[in-house]
Amino acid sequence: MAYNNDKIRKSENKKGASLRNPAPSLRGRAGGEAALKDGWAADIAEAVKVMKQGGVILYPTDTVWGIGCDATNAEAVKRVYEIKKRDDSKALICLIDSDKRISRYIRNVPDVAWDLLNIATKPTTVILDNASGLAKNLVAEDGSIAMRVTKEAFSKELCYRMQKPIVSTSANISGEPAAQNYRDIAPELLEAVDYVCKSRRNEHEPHVPSSIIKLAGNGEVTVIRK
């Protein structure tokens, strides 16, 4: 479908915004305070440590549980494909904590991208062209990458502390149902990764994958998954 400028106003304050790079901290931020309050600090710190060493983790996200790693580490990304038994020609999603990070990894971000992120009422993954600075085996053959800004407290703080995009692919073997909760994760996946986050393991409410929207450079929007 074509983008309609009459229905959605541009977010001029987002366009070209530069990202400050503060020292990661759990204090002084809304997400960080929530993480401390819920006892997530040690869990997040260990997950970040493992990913910075090239490891693979299982973690709760704003949608279903995910398999994650440093999205700039090609060897770690390769392991995610192997663990998931997924064809490496199928690109994976990256999770970030703020839309201000997008311009670090996407050259020439279309104005409409900011609008799509602002109006989204549910977790929404946006596929953008001209990916840069990410593991080559994470980027699609056409040079695009799927990115999602998480608003969920745990995964948001995890991304913030990592200071890089984190791979976020559903915690299941390719072709099998996604793990909506921790209890749904197959034992072989739990054994295959380097760290399994301890937070949010007791949740039982159903979760679903995100919407996926592909955004072309000319502003054309295609809905891949509602």
What is the predicted function of each stretch?
Residues G16-S18, A23-P24:
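N-terminal amphipathic/hydrophobic targeting modules at extreme N-termini
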Residues R27-R29:
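Glycine-biased, low-complexity coil/linker segments
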Residues A2-G16, G32-K226:
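Active-site-adjacent structural elements in enzyme catalytic cores
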